[in-house]
């Protein structure tokens, strides 16, 4: 049986594997939160679509980084994930300003995405 519940595996011999697994878990949790948010959006469908796609890109790029053997390519994947997470944060801000979603519903997702941006910035600089 696997030691983790993911189809994506992070090299256990890597000293940063635990952090990378943690950021992947955060990305999946964020994706779940986004799914809940987008289900409630009844207007501004372009923002709904952008938020959903960008949240998906975050998790996908972290997963792609897990499969890379090149340090430079891993960093690039983390940078792309960070940019997508930053896009998500901006869309959440726009939705809040335009009253597209209740602020209380956005707050947990925004907090999680900001933590993701920070972690991904750190991972992309290694």
Model-flagged regions — what are they?
Residues 1-126:
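Amphipathic alpha-helical assembly/interaction segments
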């Amino acid at each position: 049986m696997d030691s983790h519940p993911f189809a994506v595996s992070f090299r256990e011999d890597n000293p940063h594997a635990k952090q990378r697994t943690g950021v992947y878990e955060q990305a999946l949790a964020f994706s779940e939160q986004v799914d809940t948010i987008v289900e409630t959006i009844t207007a501004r469908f372009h923002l709904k679509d952008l938020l959903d796609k960008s949240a998906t890109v975050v998790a996908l790029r972290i997963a792609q980084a897990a499969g890379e053997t090149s340090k430079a390519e891993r960093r690039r994947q983390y940078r792309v994930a960070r940019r997508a997470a930053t896009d998500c944060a901006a869309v959440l801000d726009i939705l809040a300003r335009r009253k597209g979603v209740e602020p209380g519903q956005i707050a947990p997702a925004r907090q999680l995405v900001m933590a993701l941006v920070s972690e991904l910035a750190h991972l992309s600089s290694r």
